Amino acid sequence: MTEIERKFLVATFPDGELHAVPLRQGYLTTPTDSIELRLRQQGTEYFMTLKSEGGLSRQEYEIQIDVTQFEMLWPATEGRRVEKTRYSGKLPDGQLFELDVFAGHLSPLMLVEVEFLSEDAAQAFIPPPWFGEEVTEDKRYKNKALALSIP
């Protein structure tokens, strides 16, 4: 499946109704690998995700795993982890966004992502005033880099 998204720093936390869920992610690959293999605990659900390289558009495959599989693989992510709270909401035009507030050594970093059905829609998107600088193409803001305390 192709994932098309743009990522921004957050200038100010948005007003409105948001749904929050705690996340922890660990990476089985390093930032220099051409693919990304990630484990994620999202509330009480567990996932393994494979992503290709890319900025605006890249391939993504995700499967749900059980807690036993997650806990068996989690130790292999030591030193390559992030913890955050993900807030989901809608922009005034109905477009969904996901805002991540990072914990621990990455606090007070906040990033917001918006996914699109096409690259044309992504290019036409005008971010609202509470969005900050765009970092879609900046590899330092990929979660696998953040897991190593970069930037």
UniProtKB/Swiss-Prot annotation:
Organism superkingdom: Bacteria
**Activity versus pH, per record:** Optimum pH is around 9.7.
> Is Hydrolase a UniProt keyword of this protein?
yes
| Active-site annotation | Y27
Q: Which reaction does it catalyse?
A: triphosphate + H2O = phosphate + diphosphate
EC id: 3.6.1.25
This protein's UniProt keywords = Hydrolase
Its Gene Ontology molecular function terms? inorganic triphosphate phosphatase activity
Q: Name one Pfam family in it.
A: CYTH
> What SMART domains does this protein's entry cite?
CYTH
Disulfide links within the chain: none
Activity regulation information from UniProt: Activated by magnesium and mangenese ions, and inhibited by calcium, zinc and copper ions.
What quaternary arrangement does the UniProt entry report? Homodimer.
The protein's job, in short, is:
Involved in the hydrolysis of the beta-gamma-phosphoanhydride linkage of triphosphate-containing substrates (inorganic or nucleoside-linked). Catalyzes the hydrolysis of inorganic triphosphate (PPPi). The enzyme has a strong preference for linear PPPi compared with cyclic PPPi (cyclic trimetaphosphate) and to the linear P4. The longer chains polyphosphate are not hydrolyzed. It has only a slight thiamine triphosphatase (ThTPase) activity.
Protein name from the UniProt record = Inorganic triphosphatase
